[in-house]
Amino acid sequence: MGSKRAMDVHMFPSDLEFAVFTDQEIRKLSVVKVITGITFDALGHAIPGGLYDIRMGSYGRCMDPCGTCLKLQDCPGHMGHIELGTPVYNPFFIKFVQRLLCIFCLHCYKLQMKDHECEIIMLQLRLIDAGYIIEAQELELFKSEIVCQNTENLVAIKNGDMVHPHIAAMYKLLEKNEKNSSNSTKTSCSLRTAITHSALQRLGKKCRHCNKSMRFVRYMHRRLVFYVTLADIKERVGTGAETGGQNKVIFADECRRYLRQIYANYPELLKLLVPVLGLSNTDLTQGDRSPVDLFFMDTLPVTPPRARPLNMVGDMLKGNPQTDIYINIIENNHVLNVVLKYMKGGQEKLTEEAKAAYQTLKGETAHEKLYTAWLALQMSVDVLLDVNMSREMKSGEGLKQIIEKKSGLIRSHMMGKRVNYAARTVITPDPNINVDEIGIPDIFAKKLSYPVPVTEWNVTELRKMVMNGPDVHPGANYIQDKNGFTTYIPADNASKRESLAKLLLSNPKDGIKIVHRHVLNGDVLLLNRQPSLHKPSIMGHKARILHGEKTFRLHYSNCKAYNADFDGDEMNAHYPQSEVARAEAYNLVNVASNYLVPKDGTPLGGLIQDHVISGVKLSIRGRFFNREDYQQLVFQGLSQLKKDIKLLPPTILKPAVLWSGKQILSTIIINIIPEGYERINLDSFAKIAGKNWNVSRPRPPICGTNPEGNDLSESQVQIRNGELLVGVLDKQQYGATTYGLIHCMYELYGGDVSTLLLTAFTKVFTFFLQLEGFTLGVKDILVTDVADRKRRKIIRECRNVGNSAVAAALELEDEPPHDELVEKMEAAYVKDSKFRVLLDRKYKSLLDGYTNDINSTCLPRGLITKFPSNNLQLMVLSGAKGSMVNTMQISCLLGQIELEGKRPPLMISGKSLPSFTSFETSPKSGGFIDGRFMTGIQPQDFFFHCMAGREGLIDTAVKTSRSGYLQRCLIKHLEGLSVHYDLTVRDSDNSVVQFLYGEDGLDILKSKFFNDKFCADFLTQNATAILRPAQLQLMKDEEQLAKVQRHEKHIRSWEKKKPAKLRAAFTHFSEELREEVEVKRPNEINSKTGRRRFDEGLLKLWKKADAEDKALYRKKYARCPDPTVAVYKQDLYYGSVSERTRKLITDYAKRKPALKETIADIMRVKTIKSLAAPGEPVGLIAAQSIGEPSTQMTLNTFHFAGRGEMNVTLGIPRLREILMLASSNIKTPSMDIPIKPGQQHQAEKLRINLNSVTLANLLEYVHVSTGLTLDPERSYEYDMRFQFLPREVYKEDYGVRPKHIIKYMHQTFFKQLIRAILKVSNASRTTKIVVIDDKKDADKDDDNDLDNGDEVGRSKAKANDDDSSDDNDDDDATGVKLKQRKTDEKDYDDPDDVEELHDANDDDDEAEDEDDEEKGQDGNDNDGDDKAVERLLSNDMVKAYTYDKENHLWCQVKLNLSVRYQKPDLTSIIRELAGKSVVHQVQHIKRAIIYKGNDDDQLLKTDGINIGEMFQHNKILDLNRLYSNDIHAIARTYGIEAASQVIVKEVSNVFKVYGITVDRRHLSLIADYMTFDGTFQPLSRKGMEHSSSPLQQMSFESSLQFLKSAAGFGRADELSSPSSRLMVGLPVRNGTGAFELLTKIC
């Protein structure tokens, strides 16, 4: 037992603590003092005192034993050390030292905060260490009140009693529990980090104690410096010094003196801020030592040679890169010692070599040379941490390079374990093996082996295997005795094999021997295909040994789980080496248990391609077989059964005994259902729709009535008592589809039965297809002459729609001549970057109609051969292979080719391909292919088709790395989340993330039938198979059920009585008694409570009220009772189900009252069986369920299908925004607010007002004339006339009026224009101010040199273009520009400048508004306009300014610019500035649109977010249903729970666009994890900072940074997270590791 305990101590660590060795501890650990950088002598022997001294252990090919422990191979190595000449900073702590020095005065060494503030911080840190997290947080809230009270002795201890009772209570708590390191959670870690960071914030400029200027220490160029003022220098060197202030480098020994003084004053504070100071086992308080010496290094540890082995290049020994760093340190240390020796005794004591080294040092004086030598030593020590910290060090590996990145020590070796007993080869398909089998080549079966203990029961079999030896299967490779010694079985010595076999059980005293036998049929192997994106990527298969094969043989059904095909894919096989591992592989990881995908609970396994065709042909009506064929096919499907097969009677007796194809399948189903279970009943549908079977007019029945709809048609599948009565079985029933036959068999009888059925179907379909055959011919794709003529006619028409599409995009009423249309099209392309989008939309809308006409003409009625005789249609409609799009491309046309959702772009020449003319309007030039594969396509069409294929390949290649990193971030954060025995979901530090997994506690794989009407019908039809009487009797507890039903009745009664608006009792009390509150200044805020005085008066009244009155209020306005599952745990109380399940039961009972008790019992039993099992690693499954489907998404940003091209970020970029970045500045923020009924007109006005408008949207043209004037000096003269569009043109889109435009021009725009001109002309702002001269007459200038002028952006077309109002496509760039404009917007952002819509309900007819406003505001605003004009004219550059005072449609300005400046390009400046100048904008909102939602509601959608602005329009908008995609904005406004729901909805919406479904339980778990601490935290390095496991942090990324933090704070890792346990070689505590098994031996 003693040895067992010792093994537990060493092999099974319980926790791991990070600390720092002191110099004394390093010397004690060291076995040699390293004094020379020379490693080997001329003979290749290690030099004593060198870096490969034999006392530190053997190295490389050295055969000498270790000089310390005298071992050779087993020597772990021993540390050495280097004595440094002077202290250097420990590079781990240098930044922390800098932050620490900033809060202390370096004159008096006092802390720069009040004593009671310091005491509170210390108290908070002690509370956190003791595990009192809530109390520490309360103290943080309480701190502001205490700090506000200006009493220094507020928290001082007097006679053992605290002055403040709250503080006293905290100290009493600490007396109970001073330190509890096991309470380390992510909450405590994040709170401790926050408090520490706040305590280390830089404070005032002068010391609060000695009143001297603070020396703020900075970290510059990897050194600590502080600024020395002139006064400091004069004080040191005398009053006559004239030197100015300068930066002074702080030497390590000087800094150490500072910190020792600080520690002497504040030992407890420093130990709490830097816990590592109190962890050392060495007494650091004796002599001149101090715990803060840990921040510095006098002695440098040297790693053993085994950690830096020598490299052999041929016969030459080559040093390790890390050894080179140590050599550099030794050399620099030697030079430093030379300088120190010189400073002590002069040159006389130096050797010639030392003198030479001294002279080569940079610096004039000895002190300067000492600084140079010390700095070199410090840099070389820093390189030991990170080689990138030195520019000179080109090679070498620091600690950072050793442990970080994928190839680093942690991820490559400590996390990535390499395994034996594995095989890898190519996979090939095999339909003849079972679904849960894997075909293994016999060469693998002989090499892989399994250890079997020899017992009396298996010795005979094992002896035969030993006799066969390693080369004959089944054989054995070697025998292992009780001591672990292995004896290889010889292949060429039969007599020795015989003797080894006889000795297997010869002497029981020798202990149990173990025979390593070959792989046998039925052994389980773990198959894995990389990338392993989700749980089914590794499954357990039973081995089937195949002789003469070289590849793995895999069943088709498993391809989807592995995402495998047979085009050269390779897979790995792993052979479990213990009975526990085999048990898990057989029962948990096996194929039968992985039939459903954890992502959404849908099936993974299913038959494909040929088997689907065969199944349809076999089960089609009219297919009959004689007795021989019937029994042959049944035997093919059931050959693996080891019991009597039940056969069905024939369908037809006369004239011949025949069985239908349906009966063959029915026989298989009946025989596979286990004995004792009721047979399956199923009503379902086939994939082939009923209309496809109606190829001719139905024949009226001889007797009876016509069946209605699809009744009794082949599209309706009906199974009764296990017999297929109606319908064909196609992909819908035995493919990887939800609620098909295989899925229903899985639900009723389990995975083994469904897997067996799949295997049986595979074999019978394979055999039948060999009899029946299947092929495609040209006849299957040909269309009739009539259809082909119609097709050609439609194609001729569609080739001429190009001009119409362009005219519609240009908004031309009449279609102009072709040449003129091309010119306008070219001008539109140049002018408006959004024109292409509009043109694409017009082309698509026109061409879609023609495409649909062609398809409906040719398919399916236009085909020569009709379904089901048409094999291509049979293949597509049954789901075997292909889609209707493929058949259309073959027989009809290819249609429009799109690249990233757009038509192929034009080159700079205006051509899409060189074979087209510039700006050609034909659909063909835009990628519309009217050809088909049957008759061939043109070269241009082929090129467009290849472009689309190339886009898919590029997108796949690029997104792989993005989605891979996304999944890694998810996995590393969520790896510790698992279900516990109380059904809560907790992290590895025991933090509760969810009280019920997925909010209902149900496992996704077991709850797929808790769904719709079909599921309830199916479950009741098969109630006898689900509700087995014995099980129901054990589960059903009438007493428990009565309690649950009483609670549910209580909830129902509350729901009936609940008022329209839910309010609390206190709210009603306040409304009734608000008149009785009498307080002075009722609206004044109490700074202590944050409440109004009036509200505090109401609270006092409520507190004074009688208990009976309060009880009456509470009874009348009672809250809704808690849900049943919150009161009665589902695993303990029979009948406790979620609200959703309760609703399903109630709805079904209303439809079928007779089955009320049946469906209720079914759902209750299924709830208990479907609960998530304790130990289930739900975090990993959720991460995989997001990461795996993300590989199917593209990287592009798609557009909102509405007016104004509202951009919406989708795909991986949006997932990264939400999950990895948790960004508060998302790329496309938006709001969706429903419009109240009857408010559409007012909502339209609001939409117009919300649209942001730039000056470019309002300008018709700008005319610029350039001249030269000579008076008063030579200068350029610019005359600019700005002509604005009439308001009728833009009033439907923008809420700005002409008067406001003019006001914006002379108040803001011209200031910006002058500033831009001066900037381009290299004129500084200072020059502009200095050059101002006396005002000259504006009209005095000559215009002798006037140009003809040019017009910027003249537009003769209609200017009502939505797209021109849009800002730049690049949202990020737009954001930057908006930030840059903030200072400019201050000039015009007051209420007079920008029209604001206060209440749209007050607006009357627009025409009246216009007239009244223009007339009414003129008189009020004239003064403001005149002053603005005066300010503009006061600028020296402005010579004249005038504007249209009547209609406000133009303004004109004349500017002068000295010829001393570079002549600017005004055209480009104005164009750029007009596009950036915002005339009107509601803050943070660019534009708005109105669209119709899913429920036919009208919604207002905004590009940008301003929730506060929306609150002003509560009469128009339904603010109770406001939604925004900005999670931070929702969290700030509505709280973190609302934000959590937005995360779920947003991630779900991202996947929904691609037709991907992810179960809500996964999303809710991720959302709850990200909002765990009340804030929205990303799944990134920033979010990982809050983890309580340092090893988990280091295994993610930035390993060195997290290692520094763990060492500095002296953190301990309890080895509870999966990553930390893997790193130290322990099994993870999830899954089967969550518990231990106790075996009953006797």
UniProtKB/Swiss-Prot annotation:
Region of interest called Bridging helix, as start-end residue ranges on this chain: 939-951
GO biological process: transcription by RNA polymerase I
Assembly and interaction partners: Component of the RNA polymerase I (Pol I) complex consisting of at least 13 subunits.
Composition-biased stretches (Acidic residues): 1340-1350, 1362-1373, 1386-1424
Bias type Basic and acidic residues, positions: 1351-1361
Enzymatic reactions: RNA(n) + a ribonucleoside 5'-triphosphate = RNA(n+1) + diphosphate
Modification Phosphoserine occurs at: 1364-1365
Species this protein is from: Drosophila melanogaster
Protein name: DNA-directed RNA polymerase I subunit RPA1
Residues that hold Zn(2+) according to the record: 66, 69, 75, 78
Binding-site positions, Mg(2+): 565, 567, 569
